[in-house]
Amino acid sequence: MTGTVSRRKKIAMIGSGMIGGTMGYLCVLRELADVVLFDVVTGMPEGKALDDSQATSIADTNVSVTSANQYEKIAGSDVVIITAGLTKVPGKSDKEWSRNDLLPFNAKIIREVAQGVKKYCPLAFVIVVTNPLDCMVKCFHEASGLPKNMVCGMANVLDSARFRRFIADQLEISPRDIQATVIGTHGDHMLPLARYVTVSGFPLREFIKKGKMTEAKLAEIVERTKKAGGEIVRLLGQGSAYYAPALSAITMAQAFLKDEKRVLPCSVYCQGEYGLHDMFIGLPAVIGGGGIEQVIELELTHEEQECFRKSVDDVVELNKSLAALG
């Protein structure tokens, strides 16, 4: 008796640095999909792939982890996660640059990646991680021509996770019981939605009323969330966060591969939502087998709208700079 053999799922990691290698490892642990680690740096993807592959024996999972320096190896990938690009401006100290300064360097890289994805896996769900995030998602989308619902960016899942962790630590409870969302751009003008935070379904404001947290402490947590990436950079002295960013991207990939219909905040294309058009920015969205299946619109107060507008203005200016590059 013969039957149809289902094809194994495949994820391509474009960029095999700390985030890329960690994402490969997470795929091994979760037995999520076969992995291709791609990088233009010879030796890096080969070494990371070998290390991740050997971990399958210990994890008792059956995942193929291979390496590539040529785009044809990513052919047929169901998901592509892009971390390729510079993480700091050459010749400048950590105090002399911001994520936005990476634009001219990383736009060129993203456009090259877009051509490879367009040629070899045009049906893939693409998650961009490269900074400046929202602008780089737009850059990839325009260069690749992939459908809007199949292109998004990872930042807000990470920002929201940090927000949840800080609140959980203050309340001395598990972060799994904290529901909190950060929208807007991945930078100083991100908007942690403190008003919408719940604890196992109960409004955080009820805990504040009972003295479990003060309004001042909540405001402090909001500001810490905005600076959380920089806090890690300063503590490390070299490099930046990679465990939480990697898990954030894999969570999004899993939602697509398993059609989980997860509500996850991420950089998505706006078609009138929040009064925005033709731009990518961080908003809560439903991720399932159809990619970005729905963008969720929340009611914002006047103050929240003003904060969100600052995020929008940041992205608009970056998009103008992107267009000026030609």
From Swiss-Prot:
It holds the Pfam family Ldh_1_N. It catalyses: (S)-lactate + NAD(+) = pyruvate + NADH + H(+). GO terms for molecular function: L-lactate dehydrogenase activity. The active site is at H186 (proton acceptor). GO terms for biological process: lactate metabolic process. Pathway: Fermentation; pyruvate fermentation to lactate; (S)-lactate from pyruvate: step 1/1. It is an enzyme of class 1 (oxidoreductase). Its EC number is 1.1.1.27. NAD(+) binds at residues 39-60, 131. Substrate binds at R99, N131, R162. Keywords: NAD, Oxidoreductase. Homotetramer. Belongs to the LDH/MDH superfamily. LDH family. This is L-lactate dehydrogenase. It comes from Toxoplasma gondii.
